[in-house]
Amino acid sequence: MRHYEVMVILDPDLEERSVSPLIENFLSVVRDGGGKVEKVDTWGRRRLSYEIKKKPEGIYSVIDLQAEPAVVKELDRQMNLNESVLRTKVLRPEMH
């Protein structure tokens, strides 16, 4: 298994209480695929440096996880299909 960091920018029109269940729904893909979620850090509503889908701000969330590459690819695909997700970025952080 490899370590990944996933950044998700969600639609700012979402209610605060619906953000966590939405992210948990995505993370079920990782858990079902045998991966493990180490940390979920929701930063809240932040201003974007440029508009994405005509939205000037978004709800940022950073997820640290360990999973196989195919599982992370499926997670990214599921997120991109959801209309509440403005942008995703999957990174493999450097080990120090």
UniProtKB/Swiss-Prot annotation:
One GO process term, biological-process aspect: translation
Keyword list, A-Z: Ribonucleoprotein, Ribosomal protein, RNA-binding, rRNA-binding
Keyword Ribosomal protein annotated: yes
The keyword Cell cycle is annotated on this UniProt entry: no
Annotated GO CC locations: cytoplasm; ribonucleoprotein complex; ribosome
GO molecular function: small ribosomal subunit rRNA binding; structural constituent of ribosome
Top-level taxon: Bacteria
Pfam families reported for this sequence: Ribosomal_S6
Similarity field: Belongs to the bacterial ribosomal protein bS6 family.
Described function: Binds together with bS18 to 16S ribosomal RNA.
PANTHER family listed in its UniProt record: MITOCHONDRIAL 28S RIBOSOMAL PROTEIN S6, SMALL RIBOSOMAL SUBUNIT PROTEIN BS6M
Name of this chain's protein: Small ribosomal subunit protein bS6
Species this protein is from: Streptomyces coelicolor (strain ATCC BAA-471 / A3(2) / M145)
